[in-house]
């Protein structure tokens, strides 16, 4: 399983808020895409040397959001991300 500790933390967070009802595969995929777009937005209209500490902090937050939704979607389909990466490399 992909990062079981993170998945456990995420699932507890979701359960406390009664959000399971909203987490069908379609909504998980949409949320993953939306968060990925927020990563892209940080780099829009900038040059490489314009990425400052504030943007790096924002990037960290957005990457965490992407990881959150990626783990949930993978977990829904019992996909181990590390195994999928290994298989993809072959």
Please name every model-derived segment:
Residues 1-63, 67-90:
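Flexible "arm" and connector segments at domain edges
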């Amino acid at each position: 399983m992909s990062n079981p500790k993170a998945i456990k933390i995420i699932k507890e967070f979701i359960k406390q808020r009664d959000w399971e009802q909203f987490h069908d595969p379609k909504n998980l995929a949409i949320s993953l895409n939306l968060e990925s777009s927020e990563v892209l937005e940080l780099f829009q209209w900038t040059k490489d040397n314009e990425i400052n500490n504030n943007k790096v902090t924002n990037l960290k937050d957005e990457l965490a959001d992407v990881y959150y939704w990626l783990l949930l979607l993978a977990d829904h389909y019992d996909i181990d991300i590390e195994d999928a990466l290994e298989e993809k490399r072959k």
